[in-house]
Design a protein with these regions (language model features):
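Juxtamembrane segments flanking the first transmembrane helix
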Residues: 1-83, 88-96, 107-111, 133, ...
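Membrane-proximal, non-catalytic sensory/regulatory domains of signal-transducing membrane proteins
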Residues: 57, 93-142
Length: 150
């Protein structure tokens, strides 16, 4: 009789714990994901702002080095949207990037961000673009990208 009572109490507590964990998972996972994404976006923006201090002539030669330091894919885009260098792909086969939402936002505000699917890498990516200016003239953009799958 004591073992049946123990089993009923144990089963009740077990069910309650599973329900509490499920509810916490449902509500906390999106909040944690948003917090982590925001932190990654802020770090990428910081890296992009530092890179944007370089000239458009310097950036393409250092794209691999910059990508390694930022732990992100780096794309150098001229003011017309043509890709001048990319740390992951050959720039000759890449589309014009001027109409990408993060680039358009960077054109208007100096920094632009977007979360969207990359056809090139076939996964959801976080993008940060920073306008590169020389003597107050827009020269192009530094765009950083990281997978949201990581």
């Amino acid at each position: 009789m004591k073992s049946r009572l123990f089993f009923k109490i144990f089963a009740t507590y077990l069910i309650m714990m599973v329900l509490v964990i499920a509810v916490m998972e449902f509500f906390l996972t999106p909040a944690i994901r948003d917090t982590v994404t925001k932190g990654v976006m802020e770090r990428m923006t910081g890296h992009g702002r530092i890179m944007a201090l370089m000239t458009m002539d310097e950036l393409p030669a250092k794209v691999g080095e910059l990508a390694a330091g930022a732990e992100a894919r780096v794309t150098i885009i001229n003011a017309a949207g043509k890709v001048r260098a990319d740390s992951s792909e050959k720039d000759q086969k890449m589309d014009n990037h001027l109409n990408r939402s993060e680039v358009q936002e960077a054109r208007l505000k100096g920094v632009g961000t977007a979360i969207r699917y990359s056809r090139t890498l076939q996964q959801n990516m976080l993008y940060v673009a920073v306008a590169v200016r020389e003597k107050d003239r827009l020269q192009g953009y530094v765009r950083l990208a990281r997978s949201l799958e990581e």
